[in-house]
Amino acid sequence: MEFKVIAEYFDKLEKISSRLQLTALLADLLSKSDKAIIDKVVYIIQGKLWPDFLGYPELGIGEKFLIKAISIATNTDENSVENLYKSIGDLGEVARRLKSKQQSTGILGFLGTSSKESLKVDKVYSTLSKVALTTGEGSRDLKIRLLAGLLKKADPLEAKFLVRFVEGRLRVGIGDATVLDAMAIAFGGGQSASEIVERAYNLRADLGNIAKIIVEKGIEALKTLKPEVGIPIRPMLAERLSNPEEILKKVGGSALVDYKYDGERAQIHKKDDKIFIFSRRLENITSQYPDVVEYISKYTEGKEFIIEGEIVAVDPESGEIRSFQELMHRKRKSDIYEAIKEYPVNVFLFDLMYYEDVDYTTKPLEVRRKLLESIVKPNDYVKIAHHIQVNNVEDLKSFFYRAISEGGEGVMVKAIGKDAIYQAGARGWLWIKLKRDYQSEMADTVDLVVVGGFYGKGKRGGKISSLLMAAYNPKTDTFESVCKVASGFSDEQLDELQKKLMEIKRDIKHPRVNSKMEPDIWVEPVYVAEIIGAEITISPLHTCCQDVVEKDAGLSIRFPRFIRWRDDKSPEDATTTDEILEMYNKQPKKKIESPPIDESV
């Protein structure tokens, strides 16, 4: 299969904003792809070489490396490449223009390369894999030579998307949900197969693997798919409410209630003597927690399992729970064994999804919890999350206050009974978060996605000082603007912000972003931040839940304030538009709706 086919489809996809059109075009690409390499095609569409959970290196190629490779491939002086890049702001477009110029002036033939020698997807994939995996002395020069070699063989359009792929900035506006729908259309006979494909992806979060199974065995093979140790399950997510009475009513009057710990959610896999730890974002974080690997090996029973819990920093002297920030300090230390001494951790387990070749995601919570408790040996490091069973509001409140007093964020209220399955990859009312209230503020924080930035004035002139934030709409796979955040940042964070956003800056709005407000710069929807505010209000400036509460208006957050970055969350893990609407409906209503803030100031 020629890489040109993918490049041509990427070129079309980049110009489309309609999700339906994106999906149809993507389905067409998948149906025309070589089935023998369908997994690689899917990974390339996702903008990666392999799933994050494998823990393999990313391409990690900086601008200077790419400029050098483009310079060699197009026989252009490096300074000229750099100047063109400064003028255009897109290295992919720089590569396209220089390759076009090279072809038109006949230099290509002079250099001994032939446009008839087409670039194959297999060749692109194997070469880029070598670039990613090459380390040690001389690796820099080898990486540049390998990239330059690919670019020499590429036509202008191929060069554009090769460079963007290596940068990690394809800019074609495709999320995993769109890929899933396209796979259902291409291989499953239509949109009706989406649920089958989505269920399989939720149990095995590897789109390339799912595509390979479909083309080799058919869509029916996905129906019997079970979790597999080493491939993470997409985590079950909770809804949120701030009223204990309503929560208990939602779950049917009785529930299992766990402490909600302020740590890092972890999915732990074991097969024989091998143990893997995956983050909430399904990244392989095993190397960050050698102590947890040791604890699981020592204090759990079973040859093969997938369990879930929270890794929490604890005080080395008292054993008391420390904050999430303490855990982040540990992750920033270069010497992991020194970090283990300074920031020890405990693991609080709360679920079991797979055990000894049996899929437990379809079994009730009480069955899963009972088995989980039976495989943990008595010890001081790996424990079952502190929990009780409640059937009245008083007990729920009492346990909630106890959780807060002992350093927790609140509690997780979980439905029990035969229907209380593990809903992989889904957010629903089987689990409900009850977190502490914030005085004079919203009942809970929200996690929003950065989609744009605004330049400051005065001493912050010319630098980003506020952010356009959006909530995720899973129904449309888009990000809808909610607020503009300008407070809560330290000077150090603002300086860091400038660098972060410049790396993901876009010339135009991302196809998955829905916003009336025009920021000074648009960015890729990559970063997630935790935000608090005074209340949720109706606003004509924002698109979150537009026309749902009031015609021509959406919902916004009044007096939003930045709390922290949520590096553990992907953009699709952000607070949903439905959750924002639910929070709006639950907050005490004033006689007159708060006027929208003029966010242009």
Curated annotation (Swiss-Prot):
Protein residues bound to ATP: D258, R265, R280, E310, F350, R427, K433
Region (Disordered): 568-601
InterPro entries: ATP-dep_DNA_ligase (IPR050191), DNA_ligae_ATP-dep_bac/arc (IPR022865), DNA_ligase_ATP-dep (IPR000977), DNA_ligase_ATP-dep_C (IPR012309), DNA_ligase_ATP-dep_cent (IPR012310), DNA_ligase_ATP-dep_CS (IPR016059), DNA_ligase_ATP-dep_N (IPR012308), DNA_ligase_N_sf (IPR036599)
GO MF annotations in UniProt: ATP binding; DNA binding; DNA ligase (ATP) activity; metal ion binding
Record: active site: K260
UniProt keyword terms in alphabetical order: ATP-binding, Cell cycle, Cell division, DNA damage, DNA recombination, DNA repair, DNA replication, Ligase, Magnesium, Metal-binding, Nucleotide-binding
GO biological process, one term: DNA biosynthetic process
Catalytic reaction annotation: ATP + (deoxyribonucleotide)n-3'-hydroxyl + 5'-phospho-(deoxyribonucleotide)m = (deoxyribonucleotide)n+m + AMP + diphosphate
EC number annotated for this UniProt entry: 6.5.1.1
Electron transport listed as a keyword: no
Cofactor list: Mg(2+)
A Pfam short name: DNA_ligase_A_C
PROSITE patterns on file: DNA_LIGASE_A1, DNA_LIGASE_A2, DNA_LIGASE_A3
Function: DNA ligase that seals nicks in double-stranded DNA during DNA replication, DNA recombination and DNA repair.
HAMAP family hit by this protein: DNA_ligase (MF_00407)
Family: Belongs to the ATP-dependent DNA ligase family.
Annotated NCBIfam families: dnl1
PANTHER family: DNA LIGASE 1 (PTHR45674:SF4), DNA LIGASE 1/3 FAMILY MEMBER (PTHR45674)
Protein's UniProt name: DNA ligase
Origin species: Saccharolobus islandicus (strain Y.N.15.51 / Yellowstone #2)
